[in-house]
Amino acid sequence: MGTTLAEKVWADHLVRKGSDGAPDLLYIDLMLMHEVTSPQAFEGLRLAGRKPRHVDQLIATEDHNTPTVDIDRPNPDKTSALQLTTLEKNCKEFGVRLHPLGDADQGIVHAFAPILGLTQPGMTIVCGDSHTSTHGAFGALAFGIGTSEVEHVMATQTLSLKPFKTMAINVEGKLPADATAKDIILAIIAKIGTGGGQGYVIEYRGEAIRNLTMDERMTVCNMSIEAGARAGMIAPDETTFEYLKGRPHAPEGELWDQAVAYWKTLKTDDDAVFDKVVDIDASTLGPYVTWGTNPGQGLPITASVPEPDKIADATKRAAAERAITYMGLKPGMPIKDIAVDTVFIGSCTNGRIDDLRQAAAIMKGHHKAENIHRVLVVPASSRVRLQAEKEGLDKVFEDFGAEWRNAGCSMCLGMNPDKLVPNERSISTSNRNFEGRQGKGSRTHLASPSVAAATAIRGTISSPADL
């Protein structure tokens, strides 16, 4: 019997096979780090008198707590400032490469690494961050870990893990012109639920997936965790190789040829058997938006807010009632009737150059609606920012009435100055719409950059077709 992509990468990194139910010992190629989940790990290393086993395989950046304006001024939030200075001190003490705020390569941890060519097919990649699954778009086995595991990887460059189950999600057919990668993953999560992928590595397959750019593939893999999965992967192909070629950390010359030869072997065998298979017809998809307080509460933009009294399952009915109350909605109201206060375009889900181009193409020649308080456009990395400015996208955003910011996690989460106030409603290209995710009492609707841009123009949740 053949093996899946995930099983092949696992086998290539197996240091020791566990016996009698014990976990395997897996070698880790690359660990990415940021200011939030690393302090205790560094302290543990310090107290044990250890040094990193392979410091050249550890790379850090500042992203979660960083301001996206006035980055040359002192951080007014003392806790955030402490976390940032602590990371800088720890990296200096232990010799870990750091891309700090203001550095040309600084950015969200899951955005700067692919751009630099650090993320490559067949690698094992970890980070103390759940959205590490983003890197699976390259055919890497990438997943988030806890702080104690961060320390373990620094000390040993390995992790003890039991093999994950495997799931295939086949997205066959052609994606309609008004549908995007974000709509694919929101539709998947709406179908299988936020726990549907629990314990699995999801491999995204099919014509619609193969036709995506690398930026779009990263969007899909990024939200694997919102489906409950440990990781998401897409088999590398010519699109992957073209993206990587010539990047700072990509192999060169003969090493490039050798790497590509290996990368081409990283695909699921025809006779491999997945533990679970889900099929999606891409031709039926369109713009999706979340209405509730978890990423699985999503619907086509043409739908209406669910009516709880029509939901048979008592648990789901109660969840819908709570979400509708928190979000300040009415059962049965059309999604397109929902007025929005703030628009956020950015995050490790949708802050890449393809995303910014998508939004700019829709915003060009328009101005934000009067009821929209603010539109924040935040590139996922400093390199994305520079590329966008080279293309004149920043001018498009500013003419539209949007704020063009520096790179960072920004309004994806309430850990930096970019927050919503209680009851403020946003449409956001980020990945989570939990209660209070964007600030205490915040109300978040997840959507693609194109839907976010159209919403900013009309003031109510809209698709480009509504313009």
UniProtKB/Swiss-Prot annotation:
Matching PROSITE patterns: ACONITASE_1, ACONITASE_2
Cofactor mode of binding and number, as noted: Binds 1 [4Fe-4S] cluster per subunit.
Entry keyword set: 4Fe-4S, Amino-acid biosynthesis, Branched-chain amino acid biosynthesis, Iron, Iron-sulfur, Leucine biosynthesis, Lyase, Metal-binding
EC numbers for this chain: 4.2.1.33
Swiss-Prot/TrEMBL cofactor(s): [4Fe-4S] cluster
Reaction it catalyzes: (2R,3S)-3-isopropylmalate = (2S)-2-isopropylmalate
Stretches the record annotates as Disordered: 423-449
Binding site for [4Fe-4S] cluster: 348, 409, 412
Role this protein plays: Catalyzes the isomerization between 2-isopropylmalate and 3-isopropylmalate, via the formation of 2-isopropylmaleate.
Keyword Zinc found: no
Source organism of this protein record: Bifidobacterium longum subsp. infantis (strain ATCC 15697 / DSM 20088 / JCM 1222 / NCTC 11817 / S12)
Family statement drawn from the similarity comment of this UniProt entry: Belongs to the aconitase/IPM isomerase family. LeuC type 1 subfamily.
InterPro entries in the cross-refs: 3-IsopropMal_deHydase_lsu (IPR004430), Acnase/IPM_dHydase_lsu_aba_1/3 (IPR015931), Acoase/IPM_deHydtase_lsu_aba (IPR001030), Aconitase_4Fe-4S_BS (IPR018136), Aconitase_4Fe-4S_dom (IPR036008), IPM_dehydratase_rel_enz (IPR050067), IPMI_cat (IPR033941)
Name of the protein in its database record: 3-isopropylmalate dehydratase large subunit
Subunit structure: Heterodimer of LeuC and LeuD.
Listed Gene3D superfamilies: Aconitase, domain 3 (3.30.499.10)
Disulfide bonds: none
EC primary class: lyase
MF (Gene Ontology): 3-isopropylmalate dehydratase activity; 4 iron, 4 sulfur cluster binding; metal ion binding
Pathway assignment: Amino-acid biosynthesis; L-leucine biosynthesis; L-leucine from 3-methyl-2-oxobutanoate: step 2/4
Pfam families recorded: Aconitase
GO aspect biological process, one term: L-leucine biosynthetic process
